Amino acid sequence: LIALWKPADDSDPQVAVIIVPGAGENADWPDAVDPLRRKFPDFGWHSLSVSLPDLLADAPQARVEATPAAAPEPAAGESAPVKDTPADANANVAQATAADAEVAQGTDAEQASEQNDQADAERIFARLDAAVAYAQQHNARSIVLIGHGSGAYWAARYLSEKQPPQVQKLVMIAAQTPARVEHDLLSLTPTLKVPTADLYFATRTVDRHAAMQRLQASKRQKDSHYKQLSLIAMPANKAGEQEQLFRRVRGWMSPQQ
């Protein structure tokens, strides 16, 4: 599923929520994505969940074998000299050739990674542009972008690089930076110009540590609109965990309700 739309149960909808699932997830993913997209319309908000395309950066990279240099041919009328080559000389040549090949392969891989990252960003941004345009067609007065997992990264990068005026808020849930991307969340978060809620599970050590770093980075920025909200993982009560998440997100988006 690429996208799922659920209109608001209201004749005058105020908000459209665009939900961006993470890598390996889809538009009705049971963790965070589907519960949120189904609950928001009950409170008068449109919901649109949009799956990410498969990333080129995650595809297996073809190994490029270095082609050995051809030996120079003797000039006409000359015969190649015949003499024994010391074993250590052969070893030195082999080592030098291998080192050159590794440097070339490393450079090629780095260039390919940068190109894939940019291509991935363009494809994802185009999909989010289409989602924003679709929400606007349904008369939403305000648009909120919600990202889950690596979807939070791409939502943040989209707002940082494109700064669409139609999107007024960002919610990041259990945010993760994908592998092999140009910018990480730590560098993106301070650049955001819209109010941002960063929801993380305080009971998960890795998530808590990453969230702490993002919080410190945001504090170094003047007039930051960044706010963190902690969640408690409930492995034995997933329904309760999802309800907790919805209440925290809704409470931040509409504190007066």
Give each language-model segment a name.
Residues A27-P35:
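The serine-hydrolase catalytic nucleophile loop
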